[in-house]
Amino acid sequence: MSDDSSNSTHFGYKTVEAEKKADMVAGVFHSVAAKYDIMNDVMSFGIHRMWKRFTIESAGARPGMKVLDLAGGTGDLTAKFSRIVGETGQVTLADINDSMLKVGREKLRDKGIVGNVNYVQANAEALPFPDNHFDIITIAFGLRNVTNKDAAIASMLRVLKPGGKLLVLEFSKPQHEIMRKIYDIYSFKVLPKMGSLITKDADSYEYLAESIRMHPDQDTLKQMMEDAGFEQVNYTNMTDGIVALHKGYKF
């Protein structure tokens, strides 16, 4: 279980008042929004595209479905889902950060992706959608930034249709010691320097590295999803567990 429901929580390695975390996270993403896509490619050596492609394939979206791309940021998953669900379907790109939403909206419109996509500024902990509304929900690299993860998972369960699927793509825990050592050096020595060079903001990427370490590991997140009421929960490790895709169903 998450302990984020108390009056304090973590912001990276810092302990902060729970009600202040959302604003602090917002500051990070306001700062990096304009260069977010570039940094994703650089810091993952482009591998994030493979992780996201696997997520989309695992979702099993079909024409006519309603998909929620939560914490969807600059719209990578939304763009793919929009083509899959077609004119009879709908994709909702939701993010708590208006700077990220603005970048995502402009990017998708420049690609001609309009008509079956709508944009909503929303807090994952209290989603502003009806019960039993979406066929699929994805949250990619967003859950670790949420203050009360249990509340967010419960909110996602509520708005999923019976038979619907949640997919959580998130940084996790490498499975082998040698990979953990390499990953630590890269995350804390190299990544902030990249952030400084590309976005002029080393601190935000230091937070991102710390937030990954504070996020629940694979089995803990699986248990959190089961505790919320998801069934048939499982996960797939990618790149030795640097990233994991968790899947669960609402029945």
UniProtKB/Swiss-Prot annotation:
One of its GO terms (molecular function) is 2-methoxy-6-polyprenyl-1,4-benzoquinol methyltransferase activity. Gene3D superfamilies: Vaccinia Virus protein VP39 (3.40.50.150). CDD domains: AdoMet_MTases. It catalyses: a 2-demethylmenaquinol + S-adenosyl-L-methionine = a menaquinol + S-adenosyl-L-homocysteine + H(+); a 2-methoxy-6-(all-trans-polyprenyl)benzene-1,4-diol + S-adenosyl-L-methionine = a 5-methoxy-2-methyl-3-(all-trans-polyprenyl)benzene-1,4-diol + S-adenosyl-L-homocysteine + H(+). Its EC number is 2.1.1.163, 2.1.1.201. GO terms for biological process: aerobic respiration; menaquinone biosynthetic process; methylation. The keyword Transferase applies. The keyword NADP does not apply. S-adenosyl-L-methionine binds at residues 74, 95, 123-124. Methyltransferase required for the conversion of demethylmenaquinol (DMKH2) to menaquinol (MKH2) and the conversion of 2-polyprenyl-6-methoxy-1,4-benzoquinol (DDMQH2) to 2-polyprenyl-3-methyl-6-methoxy-1,4-benzoquinol (DMQH2). PANTHER family: 2-METHOXY-6-POLYPRENYL-1,4-BENZOQUINOL METHYLASE, MITOCHONDRIAL, METHYLTRANSFERASE. Belongs to the class I-like SAM-binding methyltransferase superfamily. MenG/UbiE family. NCBIfam families: MenG_MenH_UbiE, PRK00216.1-1, PRK00216.1-3, PRK00216.1-5. This is Ubiquinone/menaquinone biosynthesis C-methyltransferase UbiE. The lineage of its organism: Bacteria, Pseudomonadati, Pseudomonadota, Gammaproteobacteria, Alteromonadales. The gene is ubiE.
